[in-house]
From Swiss-Prot:
Organism: Sinorhizobium medicae (strain WSM419) (Ensifer medicae)
SUPFAM superfamilies: Thioesterase/thiol ester dehydrase-isomerase (SSF54637)
Gene this chain is encoded by: fabA
Taxonomic lineage: Bacteria, Pseudomonadati, Pseudomonadota, Alphaproteobacteria, Hyphomicrobiales
Active site annotation, chain numbering: H71
Name listed for the protein in its UniProt record: 3-hydroxydecanoyl-[acyl-carrier-protein] dehydratase
Location of this chain's protein in the cell: Cytoplasm
Gene3D superfamilies, per database record: Hotdog Thioesterase
PANTHER family, A to Z: 3-HYDROXYACYL-[ACYL-CARRIER-PROTEIN] DEHYDRATASE (PTHR30272), 3-HYDROXYDECANOYL-[ACYL-CARRIER-PROTEIN] DEHYDRATASE (PTHR30272:SF8)
């Protein structure tokens, strides 16, 4: 069994964002400012609640982040959709990390619950993605549950996050 890298620095994540980590035409992360985490602290193809693998990542929050001045003026809060997008980003990264081919695209999610907010006073956001299944057929599909914590308190939960890897048709 090949041992895969189990954590990634910001610089390594940017390599993935440039499409240089998993090869041309394969999974890549968005670049800043849409990249919603600074490091992957742990990734494994086993373990987690379903023993199908997991990802853990962190995002350093500073008051000067791009979304605070515009969402909302005088009442800054990180848009909830950005936290959800981070979960999809990490789900797609996992599929590429497994060595699966294709470009990653978010497909859907089951239920999303927001019970708190990220404000300029928040210091650290943590993400957890716990895989339930990876299907390998005409397309590769990852299905996972996710959570997001702000300074240690769980504030977002998402079930049945789905990301597919799509390969371009020849011709």
């Amino acid at each position: 069994m090949t041992t895969r890298q189990s954590s990634f620095s910001y610089e390594e994540i940017l390599i993935c964002g440039r499409g240089e980590m998993f090869g041309p035409g394969n999974a890549q992360l968005p670049l800043p400012p849409m990249l919603m985490f600074n490091r992957i602290t742990d990734i494994s193809e086993t373990g987690g609640p379903h023993d199908k693998g997991y990802v853990r990542a962190e995002f350093d929050i500073t008051p000067d982040l791009w979304f605070f001045p515009c969402h909302f003026m005088g009442d800054p809060v990180m848009p909830g959709c950005l936290g959800l997008d981070a979960m999809w980003q990490l789900t797609g990264f996992f599929l590429g990390w497994l060595g699966e081919a294709g470009k990653g695209r978010a497909i859907s999610t089951g239920e999303v619950k927001f019970t708190g907010m990220v404000t300029p006073k928040t210091k650290l956001v943590e993400y957890g993605i716990d895989f339930k299944r990876v299907m390998r057929g005409r397309l590769v599909l990852g299905i996972a549950d996710g959570w997001m914590k702000a300074d240690g308190e769980t504030i977002y939960k998402a079930t049945d996050l789905r990301v597919g890897l799509f390969q371009e048709k020849a011709g």
